[in-house]
Every structure is written in C-alpha cells, then in structure tokens.
Amino acid sequence: MKKYLALALIAPLLISCSTTKKGDTYNEAWVKDTNGFDILMGQFAHNIENIWGFKEVVIAGPKDYVKYTDQYQTRSHINFDDGTITIETIAGTEPAAHLRRAIIKTLLMGDDPSSVDLYSDVDDITISKEPFLYGQVVDNTGQPIRWEGRASNFADYLLKNRLKSRSNGLRIIYSVTINMVPNHLDKRAHKYLGMVRQASRKYGVDESLILAIMQTESSFNPYAVSRSDALGLMQVVQHTAGKDVFRSQGKSGTPSRNFLFDPASNIDTGTAYLAMLNNVYLGGIDNPTSRRYAVITAYNGGAGSVLRVFSNDKIQAANIINTMTPGDVYQTLTTRHPSAESRRYLYKVNTAQKSYRRR
C-alpha cells in the first residue's frame, strides 16, 4: 500500500499544472495536466480513506497544512483559518509516542515549504531555530515555543491532559488539538511585511491589496497548495500567471515549484501579476476604484471573464465600465459574474483590504 500511495503522490510533483484561475488562455496540454492532477489527487484521497477510514480524509490545501508520516498513520493538520493544530495517529502500537514526536516537529518546523513533501510520508520536517509557528502558539504556561525542551514539555502536558480518542468503525484515532493565539493571522502577516513593501514599491501595487490577496488566498500559509496546483502565499499558478510574469520580465519558461514556494519570489510574482492586470489587461478602465474591483476579480477568474460580464468585445467592455460608477461596477461583478467563487472573492478581498488600510 505504501509503495502504491507513494507513486500516486510523487507524480504531481513531476507534472506542470495550471487552471483557468489567474489566466484565460486555453491550452490543451494544460487541460491534460490539470485532469491528470485531479486524478492523482483523487487517488490520494482514496488511499488515505483506505488507510484512515470513511470520512477521515484530510488533504493539504490553500489554508490547510497537512503532513503525513509513519507510513501515513500519523498526520499533522494546521488549519490557518480556524487557528487550530490537530495531531492525529492511528498507530496500533505506542500511539502516544507517535503523537509526541509529531507535536514536537510541528511546533518547531521551519518556514521552507520547498523542503517538505506534503504528498508523501517521508519525515522530512527539520527542527528550526526560528520555528514558523513561534508566537502563533503558546504552551500551557503561556510562553511561546522556540526550543525543543519547551516543545517536549508541552507535548507531555498535552498527552496527559488533552489526549482524545475516537473510533470510526475501522480504526481508533488518537488526537490532540492545540489552539493558536487569537491574533495568529496578524502574526503570520507580519512575517511578510518587508517582502510586501518591497514588491509594492517595485510594481506600484498598494500594500493593502497585496496583503488582502494573501489573506484571502492562503491565510498567510507559505505551504499553500490547491487541487488546481496553485502554489504558495499568493496561490500563483505556474503555467498561467507565472508564465505571463516570466514573459513580461524577459524570462523563458515558467517558474518552478521551488521558486513559487519561496515566499519572497511568490509575493514578487503575484504582485507583478496584479500590476499586469492593472496596467495591461484591464488598463482601459479609467476609474482607479472600478479598475481595482476588476483586478481583484480577475486575479481569481481571469481578466477575460471579467470583461465578458459587460461585453464579449474587450474594448466595448472597458467603454461600458467607464460609463458606470465604481459602486455599479462592484454590484455587477458581485452579482453577474458567472463564477460564484469570483463573486465571493471580490467581496472577501475588498473587505480584507479595508481592514489593512485602517492599520
């Protein structure tokens, strides 16, 4: 089983995938790759279900870090939206030992996503002197956790006081849940402020918009992945937004996965794409607020889909938008865009941007 699962999970790392998200160009090879990625992720889910049981499938996503170890019998799940860390195991022998090891490694892991394979059970998590979760979690004495000794003591406390078990009819699942500090989102955002400011100055994109996109896309999870193979903090797709940005910078090919998992490179690429949407694809929209609404929606669903809401002719679409008030443009995009996800996306990003502007 382990060999079969490993083969299914390694393959996504060897193919180049993209999605209609963040781009409109139809590409047959892209469609084949995307379908293949979906199939492999379906196999992943199916095999996890075989190991863990019905309704126990947990997979890494844009706002969920999930790492399996111990022949897929132990997993660490960080929900960056809810602010919870759940460590679980179905190990039949010494489950507490498996949990303890996973708790310590999760609390002390670094922030280099390129060094961790979320699609295998390889225990490639290294203990960092600067843990990614430092300050986002405190122990039972209210102290942040930087060193292995404190992490070990906290793990012992959790196993003694918060260990839970449940049966799903197939397995006994042992678990421990840790709540992150209330302002965990702000603490993660703070890690990337320098990179955001640099990209903002470089491309002329408002810092508040970059931060709002990052919050909406990944909740500032540098390990963010998606079933459409969007990667990193700003969920950049290699063969659409990534390729467009590289072309505009005179580079050939597409950014690698490791490149997009590097926070600075991801923020730079995502911000460059926002600038392209603003200055090139949607540059015919005169009012800056109306154009911002269009750019936000296009970051999710593509510039072409935004313009087609108003007219199938791109020039005519921009002309129509230019006769409308920004409020009417917002109302139209949040009610008439064909994608429900894109309609919600504009609302979420616009709301988040307002909060960052007030800071």
UniProtKB/Swiss-Prot annotation:
Protein topology in the membrane: Lipid-anchor
Lipidation (S-diacylglycerol cysteine): C17
Compartments in which it is found: Cell outer membrane
Any one GO MF annotation of this record: peptidoglycan lytic transglycosylase activity
GO cellular component terms, semicolon-separated: cell outer membrane
Keyword Signal tagged: yes
Keywords per UniProt: Cell outer membrane, Cell wall biogenesis/degradation, Lipoprotein, Lyase, Membrane, Palmitate, Signal
Primary localization: membrane
Membership in a protein family: Belongs to the transglycosylase Slt family.
Name this polypeptide is given: Membrane-bound lytic murein transglycosylase C
Provenance organism: Escherichia coli (strain SE11)
Lineage: Bacteria, Pseudomonadati, Pseudomonadota, Gammaproteobacteria, Enterobacterales
